[in-house]
Amino acid sequence: MHVKSVTSIKKKPLVDAHGATALYQIFWQEDESGKVFRAKKPETMKSFRHFARITLEPGETNNMHTHRDAEQVYFVLRGGGTVQVGDERRTVKAGDAIFLPVGVPHGFFNTGERRTVLLLVGAKT
């Protein structure tokens, strides 16, 4: 069994293609330098790629980006904003889940007045 508390995970600032967000890599198929492990880590599922928490302050975004080899789900834990998947934009709030298909540009924009917290789950395709 593998149990990790988000409070024990080192916050990783993202200031690259994902904008200035904070990422907590809870279960991740790569190490902190981005190196992908050849053998699956024991806490990961077969097609699993990552499980993380993303925080976005008001006005922040993780920028539009595409994953060529993974599909993802954002789950809004707190706050809300606008999510764009392809050409479609929708307003979302806490409790909403958004499926992000492989190869489709997507991004989350915190258009609210308080911090938004997302749960991110990804699987290789």
Predicted segments, located by residue:
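Short acidic-glycine-tyrosine-enriched beta hairpin
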Residues: 87-102
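A short hydrophobic beta-strand segment most commonly corresponding to one strand
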Residues: 73, 99, 114-125
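Conserved short histidine dyad/triad with adjacent acidic residue
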Residues: 31-40, 52-68, 102
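Short beta-strand His + acidic residue motifs that chelate non-heme Fe in jelly-roll/DSBH
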Residues: 63-64, 83-84, 100, 106-112
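A short, N-terminal "cap"/entry segment at the start of jelly-roll beta-barrel domains
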Residues: 1-48
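A generic "binding-loop/recognition-motif" signal
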Residues: 60, 69, 88, 104-105, ...
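Glycine- and acidic-residue-biased ligand/ion/polar-headgroup-sensing regions
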Residues: 69-71, 76-82
